[in-house]
Amino acid sequence: MVAFENTTDNVLTVERSLPVEVLPGGETPRGSLFLSSMDCWALAVVPTLYTFDRGDANVVDVIKQALSRVLVHYYPLAGRIAKNSLGKLTVDCEKKLGVPFVEASANCDIEDMGDIKMLDSDILEKFVYRDPTEKMLEVTPLLTAQVTRFKCGGFTLGVVVNHCMTDGISAIDFMNSWAEIARGKPSSFIPCHDRTFLKSRVPPQIGDHYNDFARVGDISNMTTSWEREPTVFKSFHINGEKLATLKKMATTDGQARSNCSSFVVLSALVWRARTMALKMKPHQLTQLLIYVDFRPKMKEHMPDGYFGNAVVLPCCLCTAGELIDEPISSTTERIKKAIERVDEDFVRSAIDYMDKYRFEPYRVSSLLISSWMGLDYGDFDFGWGGPRQLGTGNLLPTDCVFMREESENKKDVAVVLGLPLSAVNTFQELVQI
């Protein structure tokens, strides 16, 4: 490393190099890549951090060289956002400006990091590279990477990607391909970057699905709490036994049509607990939106190896009073019915809605739940074993993420979300079954 930047606090010092641009290590297609309205609604950077217990002196070079080779397959990630003649956003694959890559070292052991599922933003910023042009849409890189070595021999890999390029499932495919190439193997997944099958219909046809995409207001004045109080982002532990008890409760009070999944019952618990912790008024509309992968619903039209966004957000909508008064089995039925509504027509309606209306942020009366429990990041073996932990940061107050907890029975779950300080203890008590 030639030049370094020091990032220091009372506990942790990270010394990192100036970024170098990693380019695809071979010829790649040129031109521009179509972005769907779904992609354009996802214009936000997402940081993730992976911890690895061991590496060696070559870890940085191996990962950097593998990045260059994997970008031959995932070349749009080396491009930049641009606008076409109609003012629509695309990815410019002509210039190939590359992916900023940073090498860093920390003054501690990797165990000192503790639980990284929801890192404080000040700590996270030490281990991921945020490009200074991040807010300049047509200049900023779509992907950055930072490898940080620790005194114990372990390392972290911090990745920041623009969500317009990929959802969680496609991100897993990219990371697996990167790791395979680092181990000297060919990539087992060949991505397809054609997104034109997600073009909106002319004219738009939204129909009965409008309420699934609309926003709801805040008549409970919850926004004031968020503005006046610190927002506490925290990981709440739900063990497998609690989850089994909850599933039994959700199917024994006579309201359930059938058994429900861990995701559904956990979503019901969190939605109800958050609604009560935020002290929503009985007639306040509360909205639960669930990230649902629509790949299985679009098999006839989706190209093999599709790389991009393929999620929709079906909605459950009711008043806070209705939600709190009903048995949890009724809440799980709401959620199951919302998920069951996702078919090709729903997906097409969502695309049309996103093309017709400008994006508006969700208000605090809404909760958006995403599950990372099924994302198999344990196979990201760059040559020294897979990652022990996965973490994130920069969640919005409306976001909630379910993650797997490391446990013997593999059934424990971490619920990660942010709340106003005054609501944290109440939420904690309500999710303890």
Predicted regions span which residues?
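PEST-like, low-complexity acidic/proline-rich intrinsically disordered segments
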Residues: M1-V14
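Detector for long, low-complexity, acidic/polar
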Residues: S32-F34
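Soluble acyl-CoA-dependent acyltransferase catalytic core bearing the H(X)4D motif
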Residues: V11-T28, A42-L43, P47-P76, R80-S366, ...
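Low-complexity, glycine/alanine/valine/leucine- and proline-rich hydrophobic stretches
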Residues: V364-I433
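Short, surface-exposed beta-strand/loop micro-motifs that present aromatic residues
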Residues: D39, L142-T148, P397-E406
